[in-house]
């Protein structure tokens, strides 16, 4: 008889514990109802990248002195620098510069150590393609600047909708 009463008490305690845990979970759910969603509908809405974001590398052909510092500091020796030596002026002349973004790890060492600042990081992050050979950018493709992300219409829509929701 006492065993049955003890089992019934244990069962009652377990029911109260379960109800307490369910209540705690429900409180967390109610707390999150007032918050803004974290996700966006990506192709149609885009988030503004942070200031420290390291996107595609931009290259300025005229500033490059073909010193190959970018190749030496790259962990995977990725940038391909082709140059010829001009004997009359005793200087290197850059012929070709390319980076394969299918292999690049976007560490930013090349940008940081470039003595002439001919390399810079952009806000562009949409580099996907169906053919990996399309990710090999030469100096012409690297020289094209993408439109600033802050001027993108889909980002402006997200920022405006969030500001109107907070008011």
From Swiss-Prot:
GO CC annotations on file: chloroplast thylakoid membrane
Cofactor annotation remark: Binds 2 [4Fe-4S] clusters per subunit.
Pfam family, one: Fer4_7
One term of GO molecular function: 4 iron, 4 sulfur cluster binding
GO terms under biological process: photosynthesis, light reaction
EC number: 7.1.1.-
Cofactor entry: [4Fe-4S] cluster
InterPro entries (UniProt xref): 4Fe4S_Fe-S-bd (IPR017896), 4Fe4S_Fe_S_CS (IPR017900), NADH_quinone_OxRdtase_chainI (IPR010226), NDHI (IPR004497)
Binding-site residues, [4Fe-4S] cluster 2: 74, 104, 107, 110
Residues at which [4Fe-4S] cluster 1 binds: 64, 67, 70, 114
Subcellular location(s) per record: Plastid, Chloroplast thylakoid membrane
Alphabetical list of PROSITE patterns matching this protein: 4FE4S_FER_1, 4FE4S_FER_2
Transmembrane intervals: none
Keyword terms of this UniProt record: 4Fe-4S, Chloroplast, Iron, Iron-sulfur, Membrane, Metal-binding, NAD, NADP, Plastid, Plastoquinone, Quinone, Repeat, Thylakoid, Translocase
Domain of life: Eukaryota
Membrane topology term: Peripheral membrane protein
Catalyzed reactions: a plastoquinone + NADH + (n+1) H(+)(in) = a plastoquinol + NAD(+) + n H(+)(out); a plastoquinone + NADPH + (n+1) H(+)(in) = a plastoquinol + NADP(+) + n H(+)(out)
Residue ranges constituting the 4Fe-4S ferredoxin-type domain according to the UniProt record: 55-84, 95-124
Function field: NDH shuttles electrons from NAD(P)H:plastoquinone, via FMN and iron-sulfur (Fe-S) centers, to quinones in the photosynthetic chain and possibly in a chloroplast respiratory chain. The immediate electron acceptor for the enzyme in this species is believed to be plastoquinone. Couples the redox reaction to proton translocation, and thus conserves the redox energy in a proton gradient.
Annotated family: Belongs to the complex I 23 kDa subunit family.
Assembly description: NDH is composed of at least 16 different subunits, 5 of which are encoded in the nucleus.
Protein name as annotated: NAD(P)H-quinone oxidoreductase subunit I, chloroplastic
Gene name linked to the record: ndhI
